[in-house]
A protein has these predicted regions:
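Short amphipathic alpha-helical face segments that pack within enzyme cores
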Residues: 41-44, 101
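Residues that scaffold the ATP/ADP-binding catalytic core of kinase and kinase-like folds
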Residues: 11-13, 45, 120-121
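Acidic, PIN/NYN-like endoribonuclease modules and their adjacent C-terminal/linker elements
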Residues: 1, 92, 100-135
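Active-site-proximal, substrate-binding regions of enzyme catalytic domains
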Residues: 43-71, 82
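Alpha-helix capping/helix-boundary segments
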Residues: 8-9, 38, 99, 116-117
Length: 135
């Protein structure tokens, strides 16, 4: 079981250079867990892709529906106080605090592509490659 952030979710569904390793991650450990915040961040990423011309509106809507059907069951509750406490403990954003806080609560790692976040939280986070090489 791992917690993954929105970047990992996007790479799982939208073809990119990172997609193959993220799909290997899913095959290796499909017990992904997510805070409810993932939906808002995912929506914002799709909105930005449409706004900048990187994706058509109809494709974004289909991806949102696919993401909801795939990822909603993986969502786990996290009290906002825990997200805030985590954010304050590590001097990270409240958004990042939700993902890191859930990983702390579940006693697992956050898999993220965010280098700055990984540096801030140390051993609580890793890249997909690091996770795959450890397991």
């Amino acid at each position: 079981m791992i917690v993954v952030d929105t970047n990992i979710l996007i790479h799982a569904l939208v073809d990119s250079p990172r997609t193959p390793v993220v799909r290997r991650l899913w095959l290796e450990d499909p017990a992904w867990r997510l805070p409810g915040l993932w939906r808002w961040e995912f929506t914002n990423v799709l909105w930005l892709k449409v706004k900048t011309g990187g994706m058509q509106k109809v494709e974004a809507l289909k991806l949102m529906s696919l993401a909801a059907s795939r990822y909603d069951p993986l969502e786990r509750p996290l009290y906002m106080e825990d997200a805030l406490r985590t954010a304050l403990d590590f001097s990270i954003s409240g958004y990042d605090g939700a993902f890191v806080g859930l990983a702390r609560l579940l006693g697992t790692k956050l898999v993220t592509e965010d280098k700055k976040l990984r540096k801030a939280v140390g051993s609580l986070a890793c890249t997909a490659e690091e996770f795959l090489s450890e397991n």
